[in-house]
Amino acid sequence: AALFEACVDAAMRGATLGEITRAVRIQDQAGATVKPVTLWRAAGPFEKLRQAVEAQTEQTGHRPTIFLANMGPLKQHKARADFARGFFEVAGFAVIGSPGAKTVADAAAAALQSGASAVCICSTDDTYPEIVPPLVKALRAQKPDLLVLLAGYPTAQVEAHQAAGVNEFIHLRANALEVLTQIAAQLGVQP
């Protein structure tokens, strides 16, 4: 109460609010120092990757393109084809979809005719053992350096698919930024 009365008295004598505040705070102790939180945008690294893809597209006149080699009827490939499209579009890659091919030869012909920079095989774990080796062989016979990707990660089949020539797997547990950055580098995108 005495402090309040002293402040009122000082104001009546012409003291400013700033002067009163400074006079009152003389006896205050320094409080805790709070370090501000550093702002970080989680989307930043993805945006940087996408900008690198855009820069390459402007420089070369050609956007890195991935062909989805969808195998079999719609119910066999749709889930993985939709996942793959969204996965690749995050980085700014163009994605060419395809109707489900009935044969490996049809899928290889469509993929090669598309002129895509990479091919992603989309089907089910159960069908991959009979599809992947002959499809990769057919693709590489015409384009030995073609980047071949597989939608999914069939754990028991990974080594066999890598031996057949699959370069990378895209799946729900993949580190999307890391995988997309590796794919971009293999397609010639400079960071």
Segment roles from a protein language model:
Residues 1-191:
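Domain-level signal for soluble alpha/beta catalytic cores
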